[in-house]
Amino acid sequence: MRHAVYFGTGDATTAPSPKTTDGVMAVDIDTGELLWAYQATENDVFMGGCGGEKKSLACPEENGPDMDIGNSPMLATLPDGKRVLMGGTKAGDVFAMDPDDNGRLLYRVNLAGGEPGGTNRFGGGGIVWGGAIGQRYAFYGDGGAGLIAFDPATGKPAWTFKPADRVVLGAAPTAIPGVVFAGATNGTLYAVSATDGKELWSFDTTQTFETVNGIPAHGGSIASTGAVVAGGMVFIGTGYGISSAAAGGNVLLAFGVE
């Protein structure tokens, strides 16, 4: 089905949860007609404000486990010409479907641990944000501190990069030929080899910068969105205020080739 739009879906907020929650859906690009749906986690009813002792009338009786798809699926073309559609869950599962065979499941493997409450927690594993596709491998950031490379055809892990200080690589990675960029919740931007996961360089963004528009700026935590590569430069926003690993910030940084 090459005339389709694919997207991930979140938790249900009331029970019973529909079969279209916590999964991936395909719709016709012209009509919006549902073509197929795959549910990764059943009966996952969750509301972010219902985790404490004080609950409102709108809170579901069973809250969680919040293991939905918190990121966009990835579409890859394999060397043999076949296509695979991959998704990652907050439970740490990576799954692949055949988008040209009604979403038939090809594999499902756990690569990143995972724990309940993946929306608001870092450190317990799981795939919270998006991934990237390189020349040979696909990549996901691990909520438990790491960057995972795996074969998109089989789901078999190739290598894992874990920073020395065990910070969480919470942002979506960005892949270009030979290099993967990954942002960490402590404000460090890493560049690692796409082949073997060895660190090429890193940069601490939690510092004060002189900006081109004259406004004082300070970097902070990097999470959610990843780097953008364009015109031979790498751009990254730093200052994700929800994470406690580094203070909030307000700066957009651009890196060039020396």
Map each language-model feature to its residues:
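Extracytoplasmic/lumenal domain signature
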Residues: M1-H3, T14-I69, M74-G170, T174-E258
